[in-house]
Amino acid sequence: MDDFFLDAGFTKDEQKAIVEAGRDERLLALVREAVEKRDQERFATLCKEGNTAHGPLFLLQALDACYPTTKKYYPDSEVRKATLSDISLWTRVYEKRHGVVGSDKCGWLAHHACGAIVRLGRLQFEDGTFPFNVTVRDAEGKTLCTQGTPVLRLHIPEGGPLLPALVDDSLLRAARWFSQYSFVTCDSWLLDPQLSLVAGTSSN
């Protein structure tokens, strides 16, 4: 099993399905070029085209094909494996829904291919800008953050409990990894206060 399949957490059967599927070398070459340029939009567009033409294994073939470049974006092996495990996670979500190995998360997994997202402990983080038409001020009225201000975006990946200690650990690691940011944003559905009406106190 080669590095990509090991680092992303695939089984041998999943690797076999991906490797043995027909390959569009022309399109895969364009995908590699997009990843070398860290062009997430181009990567997503090409993979959607590939999935439409060849089926849902194309995206996974593309991630494998560009892995030598992706690996350079994640020099820390622990962080790389934690981050790329999201690929096999979404592959299994797809298989559970459709009954075949594949993935249609072209836009989301473009982050991973281009080294634009990292998983630090329980949470994922990426560079971003404050998306809301809101101004945040301190007690003296000084503007701290407005729409478009560079911020750290936080994502809550599937799998495992969301314990306070795990969240605290992730935030501490992120503070060291992304020391340039003063603000973290998260717009997950998990933060919807209405969930308290239907979820138990022990739920995420």
What is the predicted role of each segment?
Residues V167-L171, A175-T185:
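Short linear interaction motifs
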